[in-house]
Amino acid sequence: MSQVRMFVIILLVSAVATVYGQERHGTETGTAPQLSIYKLPPLERAIRCTKYYEGWHGEKKHWPYVGWGHKVLPGESFTNDITKAQGDSILRADMMKLCRLFSRFGRDSTLLSCLAYQVGPYRLLGSKDFPKSKLIQKLEAENRDIYKEYISFRCYKGKVVPSIERRRKVEYLLLFEE
């Protein structure tokens, strides 16, 4: 019985501490601190979102992916034992490169860069093997009603993957600017 009491006491203390912390550290409007991610620049939001969902690729089983999901290209000499600082630097360089590639899309360039980091820019822009995506076609036609097209990049081997769908929705919420 004493273990149950101890558990209930710890649970109550945790709840009180959480409520106290939210009141003490919330913003002027009373919103929770988690919303402070929206105060970051879009590129930083994209990087943090990518790190969260991609996870750390620090083992040999992840090869040819290292760091926060960077695919090692021919001529690169990265290994799986890079530091997190090196992984962060590689991710930022990759995202900046993709932002430059999609810069003609203005405020949507970060959203497209985040998606292209995972699916590859050729899946969006098209290549000899892939047609141009409907997402890019809509943006080129200056139609920014792209939610459905963005979320459509949620399949693996033709099947919808719920975790990828959740990721797309979070990316859209964090990075789409009206």
Give the label of every model feature segment.
Residues 2-3, 7, 19-58, 70-74, ...:
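Long, amphipathic alpha-helical surface segments
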Residues 15, 61-63, 114, 165:
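N-terminal hydrophobic or amphipathic segments with adjacent small-residue motifs
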Residues 102-108:
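Structural motif
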Residues 109-123:
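Short N-proximal segments of mature Sec-exported proteins
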Residues 45, 61-63, 107:
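Extracytoplasmic
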Residues 8-15:
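Bacterial N-terminal signal peptides
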